[in-house]
Amino acid sequence: MSFATSTAVRPEPFVPVSVPVEDRVHAERGEFAAVLSMRHAGPSPVRLRYEWVGPANAPVVVLAGGISAHRHVASNAQFSEKGWAEELVGRGRTLDPQQLRVLAFDFIGADGALDVPIDTADQADALALVLDHLGIRALKAFVGYSYGALVGQQFAIRHRARVRQLVLASGAHRPHPYAAAWRALQRRAVELGQLQCGEDHGLALARQFAMLSYRTPEEFGERFDAAPEVINGRVRVAAEDYLDAAGAQYVARTPVTAYLRLSESIDLHRVDPAAILPPTVVVAVEGDRLVPLADLVGLVEGLGPRGSLRVLRSPYGHDAFLKETDRIDAILATAFRTSGESA
């Protein structure tokens, strides 16, 4: 073990991005029906949706994010809308689609059509079916953030011959009880909204609670330190506009069933780190309220000589992977270079 410190959900609303001619590479999006043997629900019909960008014969890297992520990671010539990892994938980045084939998929259940318990093992098996469908024997790497990191762990355990290395950010081998309690209360907010015939209101409130767990008190202190206002006889604090917007945006793109089942899926996750055999870089964020540094240290210790730890200090907490893109890119570059040297 080594240590180092470094200082789906429906797609987002369409935001076109201009792609320079010299940066245009081929991308393809598809879907197919399958029957998946699910851990808690048995054989279940599913639709698997994927998108890849890059040369068809290039090494393949899977990129998987949180439960709000989806198959469209970045704008490209075929699909010009902004992706959820727009600043991480592109020309000159480690995840350069001119050099690598970057593949992402919609998590099963993200469309709201699957109302059963979903395990991270099910997601890993779904990815294996996508690889079979595309004729991909093995991955150069699996890069996972948050929920995607959990899926990456399961994929390495259940399909160990199909991935060469892992880079896992903000996702431990088990959920922390504090974070699980946060999510349980968020699900109760949704259920309360359903009882009152206002499930969208419940989902918006759950998302607002989640934003407090994704970010840090330091960031809120810097951004929302203005004095409260009295509006129509009610006191309104500075952060409420931000939270209201976050809730409304999430409701617009997320089925309630998808949120509930994928939130549960995080809390179902349990793996033995010793069963993860590929070399693994674990990225932790000091101040992450959902995945504490100590839990990721425990994951790396369980990995033994196959694991290494990188620690980021960031005011963005759990969202650092999405906000600190230059630093994440540098970690990916080192991880890929080290893997190539040891091959």
What are these regions (language model features)?
Residues 121-140:
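Conserved acidic catalytic loop of the alpha/beta-hydrolase fold
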Residues 139-177:
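Conserved hydrolase catalytic core segment
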Residues 167-196:
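Flexible "cap/lid" loop of the alpha/beta hydrolase fold
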Residues 289-295:
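Conserved alpha/beta-hydrolase "acid-adjacent" motif
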